[in-house]
Amino acid sequence: MKFLEKLTSKKGQIAMELGILVMAAVAVAAIAAYFYATNVSNTGKQITNSTNQTTQALADAISDATSQMSNITD
């Protein structure tokens, strides 16, 4: 019970400490949200680049196949 008496005797200090703790938690959450948002943005760009490269590779393969077919019929 002496522990509780010590806590209640310094109410102002506890309020300040809790405020600092909440402020630190908010700062950590803001930093985590920033990195999450940047990673989501980068992932979208990487997916777009990968899709474009795949589409280009397939278009090249189709072009090669059609040119070989035209060589067969000549």
From Swiss-Prot:
Gene Ontology, cellular component aspect: cell surface; extracellular region; membrane
Cystine crosslinks: none
Subcellular location: Secreted; Cell surface; Fimbrium
Residue window of motif QXSXEXXXL: 13-21
Domain of life, per lineage: Archaea
Residue(s) carrying Pyrrolidone carboxylic acid: Q13
Pfam families associated with the record: Class_IIIsignal (PF04021)
Keywords: Fimbrium, Glycoprotein, Pyrrolidone carboxylic acid, Secreted
Disruption phenotype: Deletion mutant no longer produces pili at the cell surface.
Post-translational modification: The N-terminus is cleaved by the prepilin peptidase EppA, which recognizes the class III signal sequence. N-glycosylated. Glycosylated with an N-linked branched pentasaccharide glycan. May contain glycans at three sites. Glycosylation is AglB-dependent. The N-glycosylation does not occur unless the signal peptide has been cleaved first.
UniProt-listed InterPro entries: Class3_signal_pept_motif
Keyword hit for Signal: no
Propeptide: 1-12
Free-text note regarding domains: Contains an amino terminal motif QXSXEXXXL, which is part of a class III signal sequence.
Role of this protein: Major component of the type IV-like pili.
Record protein name field: Major structural pilin EpdE
Species for this entry: Methanococcus maripaludis (strain DSM 14266 / JCM 13030 / NBRC 101832 / S2 / LL)
